Every structure is written in C-alpha cells, then in structure tokens.
Amino acid sequence: MLKQFFFICIFFALVSHAQVAGTSIFSFLNTSTNARQTALGGKTLNLLDDVDQPTWNPATINSNLNKQISANYSSFLAGISIGSVSYAHNFSGIFKTFHSNITYVNYGEFIQADVDGNETGTFNASDIALALGTSYQIPNSHIYIGTSVKFIYSSIANFSSTGLALDFGAIYYNALKPYTFSLVMRNIGTQLSTFNGESENLPFEVAIGASYLPENLPLRWYLTVDNLQQWDISVPNPSNQTTDLDGNTTEEEISFIDNALRHFIIGAELFPKRAVNVRIGYNFRRGKELQLQNVRTFGGISFGFGLRMNKIKLNYAYSRFHSASNVSTFGLSIDLNKNRTEIAPTKY
C-alpha cells in the first residue's frame, strides 16, 4: 500500500513548478486561520479529526466529520483581522463527504492620498476565498485522495481581482498503524481578473507531512516539509548584516543546512484524544527570518490548548512572531450530529 502512495508522490512532484508564497497574489491562502493548526506550527497536514484540516489537505475529508462546524478568528499583525468557517456533510454516492470553507482577511482602513501627498479620504482592503472539496479512498488500499476548488476575491479600494484554484492531497492512513503520511499540492490555478491588467502567479506550494503516535506515550508528533517546489527559499535577515570600519555592509550568508531547515515545521500534541490537550509547534523559517541579532526573541514558536465539553470544543493558539508582535487565535468547533455521543475519534 505504501508503494502506491509513493507513486502518487512522484506523480505530483513531476507536475509541480517553482513558486514560493510571498512573491505572488492571494498569499493569504497560505496563512493558517485554524487555532489548532496554528498552535502546531501552522501547516500540519495530518489531522484526521478536525473539520478545519481539509483546508490544508482535502484528502483528510472523511465521514466522521459529518455535521461538524468550526469558526476561527485572529486579530493578526498590524490590526489585520483573519478568520474562517468550515463545515462538512455526508451524502450518498462515491464521494460521500463534502467539505466547505470560507476564509477571509480584513486589512482595515487606510488613508487615501493623491500623487502630491494630499489626503483625499480613506479606503479598505480585504480578501476572501470560498472552497468546496471531497475525497475518495483508492479501492483495496489505505490511501485516500482528495481535491477542493477555491474561488478567490481580493479588493483594494476600487480595484479588485478574482481567481480560481485547486488543491490536491493524498494521505496514507491505517487505523492499525501509529503513523500517517501526506502529500499536498495547493493553489494550482490562475487569476480570472486582474487589478491592473497584469497577471500574477498564485502561491503554489507542494508539501509533505507525517504524524506519529507512540504506543505507550500520549504524545502525537507532527512533521511538515513545505515549499518542495523550490529548494532555495532563504532570505537574508537584515538584523544579521555586518558592517566593517569602512562602512561596507555584508549580508547574512545562509548555509545549505540553514536553508534546508527552513522547509521544516514540527509540532506535538499531548493527550490528542482527551477532553483537554496541549500543543506546541515551531516554524524554522519564521524563526530565522524574524530573528534579531544578539537577542532571544523566540520567533517561530507557537503553542496552545484544546478543551472539549460534550459536543463543543474550544481551541486557542499563541504565535510568537517577534519581540514586538504576537498573535492569538481562537477557535470554536461544534458537533451538530445528534446521533453521535462524542467528537469523532481519529479514524476514518
């Protein structure tokens, strides 16, 4: 069964192309809005019991998510508000379960000025994405594949842009095994309309993920390796520049190992199946890019907790970006299935 999964991985890799988020339009699509996801580092791909997870890996859509709804909100950096709502529902047919999601970003109000700097009023900017997805189990295997389609709308003052994107995911899951493996290709698509007539790339991304739950230890580990479509994702940190006595500035030199580590995100969840659990994660790239010279900022670290009360689950995440900025994310999940006595366990 694992061989089938690896063949799928190779196929996805062959059709991928280079694109790193941050150099493209609609970059908000690669920002986590889920409190549980955020606490684990921001890009976990293997959460099988979370109705928000299909936003990152549509292969995790499964029947146990039926009639679960979740809402998340974060007062992000610089007064930016981000949030999302997810819902899953079972139907009859080959594609039994469908998942829907709305993600939005409100950048707030800005001062509008003419070319001479004279203020002429204010304007707003926002992004929104609507997604619908489903999954399918490959017969006689433990491999599940999924896809979702996203309609994207972005506006800045009187200008706007729309786009259409697809996510593809695959996951190897066996209820008798303590591990899972995932492969995801996200944001494959194009702009339907542009801001100024110039077409821009979407934030295409390829990532693999894994999770492992030791037999006698209630601590599930998560690993994500992102941006596989491009090896060099390093950006010199201005804080690490050096200046000699003549005033010549030398940028930070990023080693092979340093760049490799920036692809990694790790997370851990203590008591993952209990009513109360604790989470922690570390994003190596964020930690390196927001590092301050000779100052311990703890950038890249995130942590949080989950609290389940009957059919309601509260999630909280605290993300450390910089010594001058931190982000709190709140999540609320409700199980609307009257025939289920508890939140679905971690299985299909």
Place the predicted regions along the sequence by residue.
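Positively charged n-region of N-terminal signal peptides that target proteins for export
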Residues: M1-Q4, N140-S141
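Sec-dependent N-terminal signal peptides
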Residues: Q4-L14
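Subset of outer-membrane beta-barrel
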Residues: Q19-Y348
